[in-house]
Amino acid sequence: MLASDRRERRVRLEEAFQRESVFKARTVELLRGRADKKNPEFVRAFMAAKQARRDVERHLRLAARVESVEQKARALQARVEAQAAVRGVLDRHRRFTRADFAEALDAAEDALAAGEDRLDDAAALDEDWAGGGAPDEDEGEEADEALLTQWLLEEAEEA
């Protein structure tokens, strides 16, 4: 919609409103002056005021209709722009929208979880071996005795 069209509509509405005000004021003035309702001047003023009132109502309806259409057009334009933005994001991330992507993502996540589980199992084996001593219990006791003996000797040397 051109700005000049909007301005022209506003001017016509304002002119109709001013005409109505002038003729209505003249009609009321004649009534207060006790003019006869058949007086040609009263009839002209009254008929002009009624016509101006219809013009104001018509211009208001037209302005409301145009504004409503413009609002709808702006809403649709915003929706189309939003769709274009969404399309741009989806185009940049096409791989995420493939039909098999969700399955591939789940499979990759499962594979990672399985790898982590295997790593945890391997780390647990290492902890068992490193922290729990040698697999043979007799060898463990001998190692403990040797360690205790070493500590006693070290303490005796210091004294």
From Swiss-Prot:
InterPro entries: Herpes_UL14
Chain intervals for the UniProt region annotation (Disordered): 123-145
Pfam families: Herpes_UL14
Subcellular location(s) per record: Virion tegument; Host cytoplasm; Host nucleus
Alphabetized UniProt keyword annotations: Host cytoplasm, Host nucleus, Virion, Virion tegument
A cellular component term, taken from the record's GO annotations: host cell nucleus
Family: Belongs to the alphaherpesvirinae HHV-1 UL14 protein family.
Chain's role: Contributes to the nuclear transport of the viral transcriptional activator VP16 during the early phase of infection. Therefore, participates indirectly in the regulation of the immediate-early gene expression. Additionally, seems to be important for efficient nuclear targeting of capsids.
Record-given protein name: Tegument protein UL14
Higher taxonomy: Viruses, Duplodnaviria, Heunggongvirae, Peploviricota, Herviviricetes
Gene, per the UniProt record: UL14
